[in-house]
Amino acid sequence: MKRFMQIWKPAVVGFLLLTLMCGVVYPGIVTIFASAAFHDKANGSIIEEKRADGTTRKVGSAEIGQTFTKPEYLIGRAASDGAATNLNPTSEEQKQLVEKRIAWWHKLDPTNNRVIPMDLVTASASGVDPDISEAAAAYQVDRISRERGISTKQVKEIIAEHTSDRLLGFWGEPTVNVLQVNLALDRLKM
């Protein structure tokens, strides 16, 4: 029994110590640092809108995509019910999904004869991407302008305001935040 305790005691103590350090202390320190240094992001990048009565309401997160389907709104990437799809690009199921989404876009805006940007007919890897490409936003400008009765120039200006540049000036592509554009479009009514 003594030999058993000599072997297992350090293992159990090590396990408990590592659990405490890796499961409580380290995450706690990182959370405190993130909350202090990156308050907005650490708390979900919540977007709040002021109401006419002076109160505010939370309308969403700048980091999580919302589903917009009305023609007067900028519409984001195809939702995949909050989960990654992981479909093979050559699979029959993926092909059918893309064809279904293309048909939906043609029904939504039958006068638009331009090629539909890829990100409007495919889901993002996360399934909740808040951004679309500049091409996807440009594809929708005429429809939004027509539906809202505003100039295409106004729509383009709002899109430009909510377009982020490439990371470090060269990584990735500029993206447009769908929720922020739609909130700005709604503020035009006020």
Curated annotation (Swiss-Prot):
Task: Give the main location.
Answer: membrane
Q: Which domain of life is it from?
A: Bacteria
Q: Where in the cell is it found?
A: Cell membrane
The membrane-spanning stretches of this chain are 13-33
For this UniProt record, the keywords arranged alphabetically read as follows:
ATP-binding, Cell membrane, Ion transport, Membrane, Nucleotide-binding, Potassium, Potassium transport, Transmembrane, Transmembrane helix, Transport
- A Pfam family per the record: KdpC
Q: Per UniProt, what is the membrane topology?
A: Single-pass membrane protein
Among the entry's GO cellular component annotations, what is one?
plasma membrane
Which InterPro entries does its entry note?
A: KdpC (IPR003820)
Q: Which GO terms describe its molecular function?
A: ATP binding; P-type potassium transmembrane transporter activity
Keyword set includes Transcription: no
Summary of subunit composition and partner proteins: The system is composed of three essential subunits: KdpA, KdpB and KdpC.
Q: State the family named in the UniProt similarity comment for this chain.
A: Belongs to the KdpC family.
Q: What does this protein do?
A: Part of the high-affinity ATP-driven potassium transport (or Kdp) system, which catalyzes the hydrolysis of ATP coupled with the electrogenic transport of potassium into the cytoplasm. This subunit acts as a catalytic chaperone that increases the ATP-binding affinity of the ATP-hydrolyzing subunit KdpB by the formation of a transient KdpB/KdpC/ATP ternary complex.
Q: What is this protein called?
A: Potassium-transporting ATPase KdpC subunit
